[in-house]
Amino acid sequence: MSDAVDKMLAGMAANRQTMNRQLAKIDEIMERSNNTLLHIESNSKAFSQNVALSETQKMYNLRPEAEMTLSKILENFKLLMSSSDQREETYSALEGCLAYRHRVEHLGSSVRKLVALYDTVGQMKNSQEEQYASEDSP
């Protein structure tokens, strides 16, 4: 009987450690995505103020590093979700599952916003390139 209890406690401890690692990874991804969004937002505000001063200046400026950061965030999220789906089945504490679900929904929402932002920035970049190409052609 005590062996079964010990095994159950060991399993719960392992699940807790796994969950703590997942939380740390989610926090890291959220921090990076928030920093990226803040950077993009500050650039957007700076450019919107300067557009009135100079029409020849680019409206959107996205550095390749920012684009790579967004891609890495999305890749890490996919890896995290695929690895956590396997472990979620063995975890049975209701409160832990509900808290985990809430965090995943929040992260999923943030990722959807990042995907939309990435697509929008890509469209703006293509539009800007087309505009420059049409200005360069005689």
UniProtKB/Swiss-Prot annotation:
Domain of life: Eukaryota
Main location: cytoplasm
Transmembrane segments: none
Location(s) in or outside the cell: Cytoplasm, Cytoskeleton, Spindle
UniProt-listed GO biological process terms: cell division; microtubule nucleation; mitotic spindle assembly; mitotic spindle-templated microtubule nucleation
Keywords: Cell cycle, Cell division, Cytoplasm, Cytoskeleton, Microtubule, Mitosis
Keyword Cell membrane: no
Cellular component GO terms, alphabetical: cytoplasm; HAUS complex; microtubule; spindle
Null mutant phenotype: Viable but females are sterile. Mutant embryos show increased mitotic spindle length during metaphase and reduced mitotic spindle density.
Subunit details: Component of the augmin complex composed of dgt2, dgt3, dgt4, dgt5, dgt6, msd1, msd5 and wac. The complex interacts directly or indirectly with microtubules and is required for centrosome-independent generation of spindle microtubules.
Main function: As part of the augmin complex, plays a role in centrosome-independent generation of spindle microtubules. The complex is required for mitotic spindle assembly through its involvement in localizing gamma-tubulin to spindle microtubules. msd1 is required for microtubule nucleation from within the mitotic spindle and for localization of Grip71 to centrosomes and mitotic spindle.
Name recorded for this polypeptide: Augmin complex subunit msd1
Species of the source: Drosophila melanogaster
